[in-house]
A protein has these predicted regions:
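Catalytic phosphate/metal-binding cores of nucleic-acid and nucleotide-processing enzymes, i.e., regions
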Residues: 4-101
Length: 101
């Protein structure tokens, strides 16, 4: 069976109550990735825009089915459970790592 890999382009971004946009996706292995951009997130630009197309980078976090942070499992040198200013290629690489776990 061929496994279809989920990538950035497959994320469903929605407007957030506080402004900006965000997407969450839970993979078959139970890991969830959150990709957010707004004036409150580590994104470029740091503004409340209405489309993911308007952002060059995003804030990313990952957790398992128990709600435990797993960001550092995939990015060992991350200084935090949240990764700032991740571009589409970096997010695609993270998403592929998650799906290979």
């Amino acid at each position: 069976k061929i496994k279809v890999m989920i990538k950035f382009k497959n994320l469903k971004f929605e407007p957030r109550d506080m402004g900006g946009v965000g997407a969450k996706h839970t993979f078959d292995n139970g890991i969830t990735i959150s990709v957010q951009a707004s004036q409150f997130n580590y994104s470029t630009p740091k503004e409340n825009l209405t489309s993911s197309d308007d952002f060059a980078s995003f804030e990313v976090a990952m957790w398992d089915e128990d709600g435990e942070w797993v960001t550092k499992d995939f990015v060992p040198d991350a200084g935090d459970d949240v990764l700032g200013w991740q571009d589409r290629d970096e997010i695609n690489a993270l998403m592929l790592l998650i799906q290979d776990k």
